[in-house]
Amino acid sequence: MPHKIGFVVVSSSGHEDGFSARELMIHAPTVSGWRSPRFCQFPQEIVLQMVERCRIRKLQLLAHQYMISSKIEFYISESLPEYFAPYQAERFRRLGYVSLCDNEKTGCKARELKSVYVDAVGQFLKLIFHQNHVNKYNIYNQVALVAINIIGDPADFSDESNTASREKLIDHYLGHNSEDPALEGTYARKSDYISPLDDLAFDMYQDPEVAQIIRKLDERKREAVQKERYDYAKKLKQAIADLQKVGERLGRYEVEKRCAVEKEDYDLAKEKKQQMEQYRAEVYEQLELHSLLDAELMRRPFDLPLQPLARSGSPCHQKPMPSLPQLEERGTENQFAEPFLQEKPSSYSLTISPQHSAVDPLLPATDPHPKINAESLPYDERPLPAIRKHYGEAVVEPEMSNADISDARRGGMLGEPEPLTEKALREASSAIDVLGETLVAEAYCKTWSYREDALLALSKKLMEMPVGTPKEDLKNTLRASVFLVRRAIKDIVTSVFQASLKLLKMIITQYIPKHKLSKLETAHCVERTIPVLLTRTGDSSARLRVTAANFIQEMALFKEVKSLQIIPSYLVQPLKANSSVHLAMSQMGLLARLLKDLGTGSSGFTIDNVMKFSVSALEHRVYEVRETAVRIILDMYRQHQASILEYLPPDDSNTRRNILYKTIFEGFAKIDGRATDAEMRARRKAATEEAEKQKKEEIKALQGQLAALKEIQAEVQEKESDAVKPKNQDIQGGKAAPAEALGIPDEHYLDNLCIFCGERSESFTEEGLDLHYWKHCLMLTRCDHCKQVVEISSLTEHLLTECDKKDGFGKCYRCSEAVFKEELPRHIKHKDCNPAKPEKLANRCPLCHENFSPGEEAWKAHLMGPAGCTMNLRKTHILQKAPALQPGKSSAVAASGPLGSKAGSKIPTPKGGLSKSSSRTYAKR
């Protein structure tokens, strides 16, 4: 009967850190799978070696939700050469290929589970991944495979075939039919039956411990059926169905616990752990009551190492999965790729959010039991060589301090770390000679807790080294420690990364000063670790980026490191064109911060290296990098002024076409206190407009005065000609001038006349006119703020441009009047004002805020007429005093009124304010 075939990964063309192809050897709810390197070349390939030569019946692939290969090819081979060379493809026989869905219909929120039926014999299986499907989440053009499952039979099954043939012959003579409905759903008579427990979906959703129990109970059920113990088989069948639900629930709890650990919410993690243990204990108790559980079934499955939930390859900031994804059937039917491959008609997809990263292997539990002999287990239950460890008993432990936990771990509660590989032994040989193989093995362990404990143990060892230790031993220990620290800085687990930073800080600030080691040792520490630290500042995890950048800044300020001037030399190295956005931004941010802290005097930063770096950064493709470069250049200019200009192009119109250089040079102007080009252009434009406006107003006023004088002269000449006519001429035509005007010589016509309101009076001497302007003229008013006499028609313009308090006024865009600036926002917001009309359509009275007909004559009618402005206080005062006037005076006013009005209508009102000197000038004219 076909069953799951174990395999190991022989080689792969590459992988992203933390997503090795060896992850495919593990099937569990929390596996992360394999990912290709970022921006890799295609095709990518993986070679698997099955534990024995077998006939493959079925392949199952669990694709990633957004890192999806467009096509996967399959090759099979009987053997490999002594040394493996990927290019020797002729040893492999091509089976065919399958195409994967681009996942656009689900919005990259589902994982496709592809089942492919094959019939091929061999021991080596090669998978070739072609170009990825493009989507917005796969920003690094990667392909990934979460899991692969191989189902088949051993290739040497001649005896089994003969046995099957004999059984078929006996069945034929006994009249048994292999298609008998009574046998449907059983394992009998089905040599090609594949157990659902061997399906990939089963392992990807079940708690590993419960999955092992289910398989054991399934074996017992088959034995009970063979022995015709049907009641017991029925009980086992029900127990298996119930345990599958239990396993899925425990799997969800494990994921939630992992999420809490990643978020460092240890209270929630502890709560989930206790919840799992309590639920597991209740289930096992029920199984024991029904005599379905014994000591053999209680053996824990082999454990998996814990990795962080948030991976660096995610397209955006990722959050751990709150629960296991659900299977959902997709009704798409795939065509056969080639005759060798036959896909299952309906594929499945695992629903998962693209923002959620793949959840990684679990934290191992303790195991007080002796190790299981792997050779005595059925093949399906044999552990992989790299993970022969056990779960421990689920017990509730009292609170322990960090030191107690570390000691307990090192004491063997979690078992021993896996032995070092040959590659690791060669790589860490010098560290092993100094620190011992046990400590180095923990530092290389796949379980993150061992790696963290190794750093804590190393820190404790360094702190306890006596002062009298020989210098050579101290140096060797230092270099071995730096080797492990450098490796731990690259770790993707946050706690291990932070532990490496603490150890590095202790070495630099305590270990080296304590033992009085030379600066060469400090330089060795910095030079070996700063490159990998800078690399971590480009991590996709924001927390890791900030942690790494802050530590680099802190380390640069250590007095032991500051004098070496090493870190600044790394920060001013030119940015690589293919460097990540986060890395470039972090380097620029570090440079800007350390420049403020260290300056350019004996710090490793010089004007030359900083300016060359900053000018080159102005060409970077990322806006934030260019913006930071501009800030650095401006900060350098504040300190060094003219020296900075040597590294920049000349300040001319061609250079200023580049917006960055324009910003830089305008920033220089502001620093120097000079006006920028924009400000100078605005000032010149405003001055030109103001001069043109004044010129037009002066021309208009002079033209008006000239026209008025011409009209007056014409009237005087007409009156003189009328005076010399015979006295007996008929005067009933009404054209004769008033008697008062006949005796007025032309050169004295403007005497005793107000040129604003047109009133004439014998009292209008120079002093009398001043008094008239100051108190009585209906066309004038006094400014309440500067006490200057101005025309009412120009009061708004006076308040905005001429008044001593003009800075306190603003213009309302709605009513065009002057309003106090502190009241202007409320004034505009409430919109209570009467909107002004264009100047050509209407005049606007600043006293009553009303619009009226345009023109100069309309001002007189509005301000002096009885139906005009109601807010002209001078007119109101005159009207109140009118009843008290004597009849003689009233007739005098009435007689002079029409003449004054007629004469005044000929003279336009000048713009601008009126002073005593100006009034005298008008009176003399």
From Swiss-Prot:
InterPro entries: ARM-like, ARM-type_fold, CEP104-like, CEP104_N, CEP104_Znf, Galactose-bd-like_sf, TOG. The keyword Transmembrane helix does not apply. HEAT repeats lie at residues 529-567, 604-640. GO terms for cellular component: centriole; centrosome; cilium; cytoplasm; spindle pole. Residues 209-289, 677-725 form a coiled coil. It is found in: Cell projection, Cilium; Cytoplasm, Cytoskeleton, Microtubule organizing center, Centrosome, Centriole; Cytoplasm, Cytoskeleton, Microtubule organizing center, Centrosome; Cytoplasm, Cytoskeleton, Spindle pole. It comes from the Eukaryota. Keywords: Cell projection, Ciliopathy, Coiled coil, Cytoplasm, Cytoskeleton, Disease variant, Intellectual disability, Joubert syndrome, Repeat. Residues 883-925 are annotated as: Disordered. Residues 915-925 have a biased composition (Polar residues). The keyword Cytoplasm applies. Its main location: other. Interacts with CCP110 and CEP97. Interacts with ARMC9, TOGARAM1, CCDC66 and CSPP1. Required for ciliogenesis and for structural integrity at the ciliary tip. It is linked to Joubert syndrome 25: A form of Joubert syndrome, a disorder presenting with cerebellar ataxia, oculomotor apraxia, hypotonia, neonatal breathing abnormalities and psychomotor delay. Neuroradiologically, it is characterized by cerebellar vermian hypoplasia/aplasia, thickened and reoriented superior cerebellar peduncles, and an abnormally large interpeduncular fossa, giving the appearance of a molar tooth on transaxial slices (molar tooth sign). Additional variable features include retinal dystrophy, renal disease, liver fibrosis, and polydactyly. Intellectual developmental disorder, autosomal recessive 77: An autosomal recessive neurodevelopmental disorder apparent from infancy and characterized by global developmental delay, variably impaired cognitive development, delayed walking, and poor speech in some cases. This is Centrosomal protein of 104 kDa. The lineage of its organism: Eukaryota, Metazoa, Chordata, Craniata, Vertebrata. The gene is CEP104.
